From Swiss-Prot:
Electron transport found in the keyword field: no
UniProt keyword annotations, A-Z: ATP-binding, Cell inner membrane, Cell membrane, Ion transport, Membrane, Nucleotide-binding, Potassium, Potassium transport, Transmembrane, Transmembrane helix, Transport
Binding partners and assembly: The system is composed of three essential subunits: KdpA, KdpB and KdpC.
Compartments where located: Cell inner membrane
Membrane topology: Single-pass membrane protein
Role noted for this protein: Part of the high-affinity ATP-driven potassium transport (or Kdp) system, which catalyzes the hydrolysis of ATP coupled with the electrogenic transport of potassium into the cytoplasm. This subunit acts as a catalytic chaperone that increases the ATP-binding affinity of the ATP-hydrolyzing subunit KdpB by the formation of a transient KdpB/KdpC/ATP ternary complex.
Protein name (record): Potassium-transporting ATPase KdpC subunit
GO CC term (a single one): plasma membrane
Organism: Burkholderia vietnamiensis (strain G4 / LMG 22486)
């Protein structure tokens, strides 16, 4: 029996050190050395203070800001600890009611509903925390943001274009606009913080 227990204890100890301590330490050091911004959460700073992450959606509801995708992390919106979608299928009546309510909220905010509403403005993403919207969703909001900020639509459209990221490696994903970065660029363009 002793001959079986000793090798098991040694293997357990070695694997604990290798997989529980050495490997995580090496990967952490590698991440900090090669990808420091990403390893620390892709934080966006303004005046030396973190204002958010490029990877997590932020709540914006003032007319002067672009609005992101809706959060599915109720009751605390944009709570990364509660990440997850609504799990409502496309034929679920609850989803249809939620979309109708969101379209009504856009109308109440003074958005021109004569154009088709981009789907990402009235639905949540699978994670419920998506930081990006489509260029179509950004274009849909240009008039409202320009009016609220007393800017020309062309000036706001140029900021949208400057903050649009194309497909990764030219083929992966879709073009997207990071809402936090765009809103910070709007503030900076007007001399605000």
């Amino acid at each position: 029996m002793k001959t079986l227990i000793r090798p098991l204890v040694v293997i357990f100890a070695v694997l604990t050190v290798v997989t529980g301590m050495a490997y995580p330490a090496v990967m952490t050091a590698f991440g900090q050395a090669v990808f420091p911004a990403q390893a620390n959460g892709s934080l966006i700073e303004r005046d030396g203070r973190a204002v958010g992450s490029a990877l997590i959606g932020q709540p914006f509801d003032a007319p002067r800001y672009f609005w992101g995708r809706l959060s599915a992390t109720a009751p605390m919106p944009y709570n990364a600890a509660g990440s997850g979608g609504s799990n409502l299928g496309p034929l679920n009546p609850s989803l249809a009611e939620q979309v109708k309510a969101r379209i009504a909220a856009l109308r109440d905010a003074g958005t021109d509903l004569s154009k088709p509403v981009p789907v990402d403005l009235v639905t949540a993403s699978a994670s419920g925390l998506d930081p990006d919207i489509t260029p179509a969703a950004a274009a849909y909001q240009i008039e409202r943001v320009a009016k609220a900020r007393k800017l020309t639509a062309d000036a706001v459209a140029r900021l949208v274009a400057a903050n649009t990221t194309g497909r990764q490696f030219g083929v992966l994903g879709e073009p997207r606009v990071n809402v936090l970065k765009l809103n910070l660029a709007l503030d900076a363009a007007q001399g605000g913080h």
